[in-house]
Amino acid sequence: MAKLYDRKNALVAADMLNYKVVPWFEEEGIRLLMILTDRGTEYCGNREHHEFQLFLALEDIDHSKTKARHPQSNGICEQFHRTIQDEFYAIAFRKKVYNSIEDLQKDLDQWIDSYNNERTHQGKYCFCKTPIQTFLDTKELAKNKYLDNLQFS
């Protein structure tokens, strides 16, 4: 899932979680327990005055942060950023002139759908499956993790 914005700040980060991420996991019957981000100002700040931190507190989502200036600590995300840059944006902007962010969002949604549902992935997590198939195969583990957390709280 991806959503384009014309700015980068804490409110936008909270909006993405509220309107895309949390509802998607809820539809799958899984509660989002933790999120990993870098230490950008859009993600980190005083909980009482920072929209993203406030959203996490209201939703009871734990927040882990990568090491400062150490993108390798979030390697999967960094690789995805490189892939989307090389395989979507670099090509899309050569093929077409976009008149609106909504037009670009439509093409991005199609690319993301293909990336998640049609394209198999190598690596230690997907084992030559699509990302959605990997998710579906491990969905029960995520549900059990939530139940384990309930028992210990």
For each feature predicted by the language model, list its residue ranges.
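C-terminal domain-tail junction helix/linker
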Residues: E59-I61, T83-S153
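Acidic/histidine-rich, metal-coordinating catalytic segments
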Residues: L17, E26-N46, C128-T130
